[in-house]
């Protein structure tokens, strides 16, 4: 099965709280394929989120992120990432933790490495 074909529409999927140590992070699935792990969705961080308790993250999939609204601060790097910025992370690339002062919304695309 592949991601479903979808023409422009208002997504019906609800915002769902991401479980774990950090509260205030929400996800909204736009399209996914459980068989391949391909996923497109939105991530929303509420003001005051700090993911430092979970430390740096790395995944076993490619992750592309486009910052639509707000800004993220990476305290480890001492950098702020703002709306309009983009990241493309290969499997295993460490990133985070993040801090927010206001609402952050990101488009996230994930897919497994092939080859």
Listing of model-derived features with the role each one plays in the protein:
Residues 35-37, 46-51, 71, 93, ...:
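Short, charged/polar surface micro-motifs in flexible loops or helix N-caps
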Residues 1-39:
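A short, N-terminal "cap"/entry segment at the start of jelly-roll beta-barrel domains
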Residues 43, 66-72, 105-109:
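Short, well-ordered beta-strand segments in beta-rich or mixed alpha/beta enzyme
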Residues 53-75:
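Glycine- and acidic-residue-biased ligand/ion/polar-headgroup-sensing regions
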Residues 75-94:
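Short acidic-glycine-tyrosine-enriched beta hairpin
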Residues 91-115:
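Ligand-binding loop in jelly-roll beta-barrel domains
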Residues 27-29, 40-44, 64, 86-88:
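Conserved hydrophobic/aromatic beta-strand scaffold that supports enzyme active sites
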